[in-house]
UniProtKB/Swiss-Prot annotation:
The encoding gene: panB
Catalysis: reaction(s): 3-methyl-2-oxobutanoate + (6R)-5,10-methylene-5,6,7,8-tetrahydrofolate + H2O = 2-dehydropantoate + (6S)-5,6,7,8-tetrahydrofolate
Gene Ontology biological-process annotations: pantothenate biosynthetic process
Residue segments, region Disordered: 1-41
Ranges annotated as biased composition (Polar residues): 1-10
SUPFAM superfamilies attached to this UniProt entry: Phosphoenolpyruvate/pyruvate domain
The name this protein goes by in its record: 3-methyl-2-oxobutanoate hydroxymethyltransferase
CC terms in the record's Gene Ontology section: cytoplasm
Length: 303
């Protein structure tokens, strides 16, 4: 990682993009940091593995539409997750349980069109893979064929390892998800920290099972920081933290939370990097008032 925070790839001998002719180190996307080219290549599972081996951290954000996907891609966010959190922030459901494959695939298509450089990961929603490997493969195939996703994510530990193995065997990259798994919120009894005390050993065993099944990364959500650090050290694949401390290989947030657009309760692990809810609200109210008062449109905005 350079002084500006840019994650840099390995040399061509260790499965990464080479430096340019002048010897300038390449960025995560393969272009020199000083002269980034608009023709960046798409981030891949090999880049994730290379970052893990070099101890380089990377970021992930959710995305659900074309416009925000273009912004995140231009900002060089390497991985975009079309999460089942769309159930909450797009469709207005109370939990992630109701959202369907048919509701998510159009969102995946939009994000893929808006992000030609990021890896786009699609969440497998509740009820679309729990029946077993055959159902999981059918669902994941739809997300790749119809949505254009490059990888999928699914929740669960050892119990879903056969499904993970089936997907990987079919050539579909997989991210696991452990800890607080929102699709199981009713079984967990609410949104609370997972993996304390002896439950931490179970979580570690689940992480190892997901790795053995062939996943290239695993999300750790709302688990103690020391446990996440231990899992990260034990695994050869990347860990992606969300409320799991600072030692994970990567971090992910719901973009509306990160940018201050979400209303209501905000989890402790969220850092708001902007206050878009206030900015957008002010802009909308100003527009409303100017239309009412005849101040908009003016000659400047007329033909």
């Amino acid at each position: 990682m350079d002084s500006s925070g840019t994650v840099r790839n390995q040399t061509s001998d260790d499965h990464s993009r080479p430096a340019d002719a002048a010897g300038t180190a390449a960025t995560l996307y393969g272009a020199p940091a000083e002269t980034r080219s608009p023709r960046r290549s798409r981030f891949t599972v090999r880049d994730v593995a290379a970052a893990k081996s070099r101890g380089e951290r990377w970021s992930m954000l959710t995305a659900y539409d074309f416009t925000t996907a273009t912004v995140f891609d231009e900002a060089e966010i390497p991985v975009l997750l079309v999460g089942d959190s769309a159930a909450n922030v797009v469709y207005g459901y109370d939990t992630t349980v109701p959202v369907t494959v048919d509701e998510l695939i159009p969102l995946v298509r939009a994000v893929v069109r808006g992000a030609p450089h990021a890896m786009v990961v699609a969440d497998l929603p509740f009820g679309s893979y729990q029946a077993g490997p055959e159902q999981a493969l059918a669902t994941a195939t739809r997300f790749l064929k119809e949505g254009g996703a490059q990888a999928v994510k699914l929740e669960g530990g050892a119990r879903v390892a056969p499904a993970v193995a089936a997907l990987v065997g079919a050539g579909i990259p997989v991210i696991g998800h452990l800890g607080l798994t929102p699709q199981s919120i009713h079984a967990l009894g609410g949104y609370r920290v997972q993996g304390r005390d002896e439950a931490g050993e179970v979580l570690l065993a689940d992480a190892l099972a997901i790795e053995a099944a062939g996943a290239f990364a695993v999300v750790l959500e709302v688990v103690p920081a020391d446990l996440a650090a231990r899992v990260t050290k034990e695994l050869h694949i990347a860990t992606v933290g969300i409320g799991a401390g600072a030692d994970c290989d990567a971090q992910v947030l719901v973009w509306q939370d990160m940018a201050g657009l979400s209303g209501g309760h905000v989890p402790r692990f969220v850092k708001r990097y902007a206050d878009l809810r206030t900015v957008l609200g002010d802009a909308v109210r100003t527009y409303r008032d100017e239309v009412r008062g005849g101040q908009y449109p003016t000659v400047e905005h007329s033909y």
